[in-house]
Amino acid sequence: MSGRPKLVLASGSPRRLSLLNQAGIEPDALRPVDIDETPTKGELPRACANRLARAKADAALRALQIDDELRGSFILAADTVVAVGRRILPKADLVDEASQCLRLLSGRNHRVYTAVCLVTPKENFRQRLVETRVRFKRLSEEDIQAYIGSGEWRGKAGGYAIQGIAGSFVVKLVGSYTNVVGLPLNESIALLGGEEFPIRAGWLDAG
């Protein structure tokens, strides 16, 4: 490749894009992929996040191999899993799913895992998994019903968005906050920088 290498974010998540922008990085393209995100039987949360991030990266790479403009780009993919013990919570799309998640999380500790997978222009894969521990306050029925009414939970792992109203539910957080939002910035930028992507190129324009 000549000139600045290109970066493709293999996600349609506004949160992941916003986090990259926060770090001064503007992807050249967004290429969300459609894969089956159902955990396999007995799959552990860590393994699930790692498998799905790799599957998203693989799918994006296949798509870009036939794209003359973006072939040879860096590809960044990620998957976030919320778990209570070994139980993986869904990415809630239905009210019943979100209600069940919130009742399970109420007053308890849970863990958020995000796996980040980077594909280099030479089609090498680099991957990191980040874990954050979160504890929610005990949620009242009024809390749950009002939060369901907000709609903020739709499509979110574990049925909540920490960067929104649900941030007020958090009693304690140990680890990376951006990991819970959907993309651990420190580790993601380290992956890119380790493969000589110009991570600081946009900093002069960040102000």
Curated annotation (Swiss-Prot):
<comment type="function">
    <text>Nucleoside triphosphate pyrophosphatase that hydrolyzes dTTP and UTP. May have a dual role in cell division arrest and in preventing the incorporation of modified nucleotides into cellular nucleic acids.</text>
</comment>
<keyword id="KW-0963">Cytoplasm</keyword>
<keyword id="KW-0378">Hydrolase</keyword>
<keyword id="KW-0546">Nucleotide metabolism</keyword>
<feature type="active site" description="Proton acceptor">
    <location>
        <position position="79"/>
    </location>
</feature>
<dbReference type="GO" id="GO:0036221">
    <property type="term" value="F:UTP diphosphatase activity"/>
</dbReference>
<dbReference type="InterPro" id="IPR029001">
    <property type="entry name" value="ITPase-like_fam"/>
</dbReference>
<dbReference type="GO" id="GO:0005737">
    <property type="term" value="C:cytoplasm"/>
</dbReference>
<dbReference type="GO" id="GO:0036218">
    <property type="term" value="F:dTTP diphosphatase activity"/>
</dbReference>
<comment type="similarity">
    <text>Belongs to the Maf family. YhdE subfamily.</text>
</comment>
<feature type="site" description="Important for substrate specificity">
    <location>
        <position position="80"/>
    </location>
</feature>
<protein>
    <recommendedName>
        <fullName>dTTP/UTP pyrophosphatase</fullName>
        <ecNumber>3.6.1.9</ecNumber>
    </recommendedName>
</protein>
<dbReference type="GO" id="GO:0009117">
    <property type="term" value="P:nucleotide metabolic process"/>
</dbReference>
<dbReference type="Pfam" id="PF02545">
    <property type="entry name" value="Maf"/>
</dbReference>
<feature type="site" description="Important for substrate specificity">
    <location>
        <position position="163"/>
    </location>
</feature>
<feature type="site" description="Important for substrate specificity">
    <location>
        <position position="15"/>
    </location>
</feature>
<dbReference type="InterPro" id="IPR003697">
    <property type="entry name" value="Maf-like"/>
</dbReference>
